Each structure stands twice: as structure tokens, then as C-alpha cells.
Amino acid sequence: MTPDDTNQTFLRRYVDDYCKALDENYKQDTIRSLEHNLQRDPECTYSANQLVEIMQGKAKLDKFRYYEGKKYIKVVREQYDEREDRWRDTTVHAFIGIAKDILGNVYKPASWKAPATKHVRYSFCKKADLLFLTDPRCVGWAGGYLSLIHI
């Protein structure tokens, strides 16, 4: 195994942890929202039922996964489609470089197929960024932390 293979193996693990952090952030944000709804309207059965499902681990909350391409890993948000009874990709959350010269660089998406490469938002090769990106309290499922104003 070459050093490049080793780096990409570690990167895949980090990206997996990144997706888990985004999942947890989405879950916590959903719980906060539902609890707020219940405070405003204690009779709201929808919010109460949703909270019970989340606590029991039965809720079909949005989740994040990634696809590997030639040059980038694409992190996407999946949503459960009740009518079709399946998960489907809804939005691109971020792109992460896997080519040698951009390894670990995190980019905001410009479109479904391409990143906005003008500015590197974070890098999995920097320890502080790695810790930030794998902490559900730091990343946000909606991607606001990827805007330049927050960097």
C-alpha cells in the first residue's frame, strides 16, 4: 500500500465520521424544533409522535452519505420518500478532494456535479479542521458553516 492509498483510506474514515456528525446535527436540530413546537402547543400530537419515534430510533430522519468520484467525494443529503418507500438523494452538501493535489480539501457545491473550487472551506489534513468537521456541535446540516463569512 502506497502513502497515497493510506491517505485516501484515512480520508474515507474521516468523511464517514463527517457524515455521522451531520446526521447527529440534523437529529439534534429536529429534536429542538419538535420540543419548541410542543412548548408552544402541548396538544400537538404530530410533534409528540415524531419525538417518540426519534427516541425509539424508528424515525426516518434525513441522513448524509457520500459517493466517490475520480477527483472528489460528493456528500449528499438523503430524504425518505414515503410515497415511493425509499431513500432518495435531495441535495449536495459538500465536495471533498481525493486527488493528490487537493486531498482532503472541503468545498461548497456549485452544482449537483461540481464544487465551487475558488475557495477551500476546510481541509481534513488540518487537525483543527478535522476536529471541527467531525463534531456535530460545529457542523450544520444546512451547510451554513461552509459560507465564507464563517471561515
Task: Label every PLM stretch briefly.
Residues 129-143:
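Active-site-proximal segments of catalytic enzyme domains
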Residues 149-151:
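Conserved small/polar residues in nucleotide/adenosyl-binding loops
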